């Protein structure tokens, strides 16, 4: 087997092992589901996003909020995954072994990220289904949604590498990642954001993704 075949096997192995491990310990998925739905419930109760009806001339503004929320979940998953993976490897003393491995580090961590995306997709589907029943949101899936979400995820993964480096340097991984995830919720038009802030955050992948997703929806 050639080198490319070996790298693919290692990539697939990382995906499979992390996915099965996460499924086996379901508490993390269940807690994520509860937190995501609870936070979305807050936005629905406070009627966040009603300004989108005028901005996009679209009556079903709750769908636009849900779209932004889905994009945000993928974005924070990218950041938390790479930061968490690096922190875990450092804690267990295995990072330097992976750095010196014959396989590129991006393949090893990339497999973990793909597994994370698959798990988050399951969680997102459940959140969307529950939201449709509880809040009566008319949500329609468009295949075109996949392109901006994919590009956003890759962009946010790159940002996640930078964030992880900073967080590990200051030894405050959890705190820094949490603050950035929270900030992204309110400065990227995931929920209505002022034009002044959007002028600054316009080029963040999540902000662009939210804009494109809503344009597709309407």
Could you describe each region identified by the protein language model?
Residues 168-203, 207, 211:
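Transmembrane helix segments
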Residues 39, 43-47, 72, 76, ...:
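Structural signal for membrane-spanning alpha-helices in multi-pass inner-membrane proteins
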Residues 48-67, 130-145, 217:
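Membrane-interface helix-capping segments at transmembrane helix termini in multi-pass transporters
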Residues 26-29, 33-37, 78, 113, ...:
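Hydrophobic alpha-helical transmembrane bundles that constitute the permease/transmembrane domains
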Residues 105, 110-175:
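Alpha-helical transmembrane segments and their short interhelical loops
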Residues 62-132:
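Hydrophobic alpha-helical transmembrane segments of multi-pass membrane transport proteins
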Residues 1-34:
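Aromatic- and glycine-rich beta-strand/loop motifs that create alpha-glucan
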Residues 21-89:
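Transmembrane helix-boundary elements of multi-pass transport/secretion proteins
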């Amino acid at each position: 087997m050639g080198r490319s075949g070996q790298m693919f096997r290692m990539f697939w192995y990382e995906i499979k092992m992390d996915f099965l491990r996460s499924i086996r310990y379901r508490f993390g998925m269940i807690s994520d589901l509860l937190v995501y739905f609870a936070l979305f419930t807050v936005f629905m109760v406070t009627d966040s996003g009603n300004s989108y009806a005028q901005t996009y001339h679209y009556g079903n503004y709750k769908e636009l909020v849900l779209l932004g929320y889905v994009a945000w979940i993928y974005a924070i998953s990218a950041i938390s995954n790479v930061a968490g993976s690096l922190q875990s490897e450092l804690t267990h003393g295995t990072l330097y072994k992976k750095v010196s491995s014959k396989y590129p580090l991006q393949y090893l961590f990339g497999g973990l990220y793909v597994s994370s995306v698959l798990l988050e997709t399951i969680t997102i589907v459940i959140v969307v289904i529950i939201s449709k029943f509880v809040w009566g949101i008319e949500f329609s899936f468009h295949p075109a949604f996949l392109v901006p979400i994919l590009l956003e995820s890759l962009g946010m993964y790159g940002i996640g590498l930078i964030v992880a480096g900073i967080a590990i340097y200051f030894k405050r991984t959890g705190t820094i990642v949490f603050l950035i995830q929270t900030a992204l919720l309110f400065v990227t038009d995931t929920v209505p954001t002022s034009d002044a802030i959007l002028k600054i955050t316009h080029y963040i992948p999540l902000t662009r993704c939210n804009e494109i997703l809503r344009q597709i929806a309407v």
